[in-house]
């Protein structure tokens, strides 16, 4: 049993979290105009994407329309710097083409003044993170009795994460009174998640110095695919009187309709001498988990938006509260044997190594925006919104591991213009995003490698900054627009 206690400490070190996956609720705004206006659709009708933001505002639409929205592309840069010249500086850049959106809101024939229907298909999450690094150096890692002189150290790290979530929404709105409208939206979410993380390091002896140990190495490799179908409901209210608009939206927690996935994990330790042991041993752990039933949760949320119209200006502000989600198990490995060869004793450690868990903290995101009408066919738009991360850390850290997350708050600055035609409207804009965390733990390191840390190096803390620029474009076609 002592052998497994030693391995628990070693293997949990290999599964230390690296943060790179999405954990923001509002990185992608639905609809180009709403993205530029930073959530103004909470309080008043902006475009046919109202079915997603606040279905009740569809009753204020003056025309029926179909919107085709897409970002032309986004460039993200992430850099870590501990400020001490130690460890590894992480520099990664990625150019992405984001999926588009199609949405429509339509009057229900002769009941147009009482009811409206909205539909939409859009990308709710689109996040790809790729990173690879390698280090080769001459370093004295192993004691000189077994490996005289310095060893050749080779370390490699690879991370590849892809998260895509596509949502289909259908909503209905009705007028309750002169000033009040109500709406409801049903959303079906299809979420696909791919994750691969590999770390391997080797300390190779100089054969000319007659070592008693030729090589010491460690490697961890974990890969998983997780798929979900979720259902989420929204209820909304809209109030309009004179130049003022108010919107309230309550979103229920997501309900799982289907989930599936698989995971393959492997750890190899070669000629490792664990702490408090005088003997070297090699260890091997491997498991393939299939037909998994993973879990994924979205919390309850409450949104409130307000806007006021002036002669040629509309000012909007809004906020959304997201509830917390207590720690839950995303992937339960069951009784699969991980440590090899399998025994009755080592099965109890599988859950500690391979269990994936998540926990979301409560937060509030806010936004402000302005739209300035230059003339009946042209307007300028700009806005600012916060996009706080929802990762929550539990002390002491439970065994198992979290999927990687971007643990920095983001702030989005938007600007653009709207050009209206007789039966259409074009919107062009740009979004600049900035995120930063000043007490961020370096996710991996090749410096300070030793047997006590399984050749992984010592991870320091420093500042991480993420900057991105995204182009935004959309086309709106009016089905029946009143003559101006």
Regions found by a protein language model. Give the residues of each.
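Outer-membrane beta-barrel porins/channels
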Residues: 21-30, 34-35, 105-484
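Sec-dependent N-terminal signal peptides
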Residues: 4-14
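Short, Lys/Arg-enriched, disordered terminal segments
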Residues: 1-5, 483-484
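Single-residue recognition of alpha-helix boundary sites
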Residues: 13-14, 65, 189, 253
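N-terminal, post-signal peptide beta-strand-biased segments of exported outer-membrane/organellar beta-barrel
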Residues: 18-125, 254, 406-408
